[in-house]
C-alpha cells in the first residue's frame, strides 16, 4: 500500500522526475522483503548520478550497478558497459548478477518498452522495474499523444495543432492565427533539443518545414505547434 500511495502522489502529476524517481525507489526499498538487494540503474546522465548517489546510501542495498553509467556513478556503484536500450544484454546481466530491482532513469528505454520486456519474460517477471509501461511512457515519448490526453481529460494546456508533411498548409494557417513568439515541438524524443521558440512568422514557417524534413529525424515527423504561454514552469 505504501508503494501505491507513492505512485498516486507523484505520478504523473509531478514534473520533478528526479525527486519522483528517488522517492519511489525509497518506497520500494522499504517494503521489499530482501535484507540486501542488488539493484541495476539504467542510464548515463546527471540524473542517474543523483539517483545512484541516493540509492547507494540505503542499508538495504548490497550491490548497485549502473548501465552504462558515467564517471560520477562509478564513485558510488559499479558501471556495466551496456546500453540502456539493449534489452537482451540487460536480461543477461540481470540474471547473471542476481539483480533484484531495475530502476530506469532515461525516457528512451521506457518508450521502447523495457518495463513490458521484463513483465512478459517469465525469467524476469518477478523483478520490479521502477518506471511506466510502454503505453504509459507515451505521455513523455509523444507530445501529440500527451496533448490529446490532456484534451480528453480536460487538463488545462496551451492551444495546439499537430502537423505532418501531409497537412503542412494547416500548420501555416495555425501559425498565422497565433501571436508571436511561436512554439514548435518535435513529437518524439529529441534528447531535450526538440523545442524551438521563434520570434517571427517567417522563421516559424521555415523551421516547421525543416523539422518535418528531418531536422530531428523520426522525432519530428510530426510537429506540435503550441500557443506560447508566459509564466513559471511547474
Language model feature labels by segment:
Residues 83-86, 142, 166-167, 200:
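Acidic/polar helix N-cap motif
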Residues 11-17, 24-34:
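Arg/Gly-rich low-complexity intrinsically disordered repeat tracts
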Residues 34-132:
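ATP-binding N-terminal substructure of ATP-dependent carboxylate-amine bond-forming enzymes
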Residues 124-194:
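A conserved helix-loop-beta module that forms one wall/lid of the active-site cleft
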Residues 155-159, 177-183, 198-234:
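Conserved ATP-binding module of the ATP-grasp superfamily
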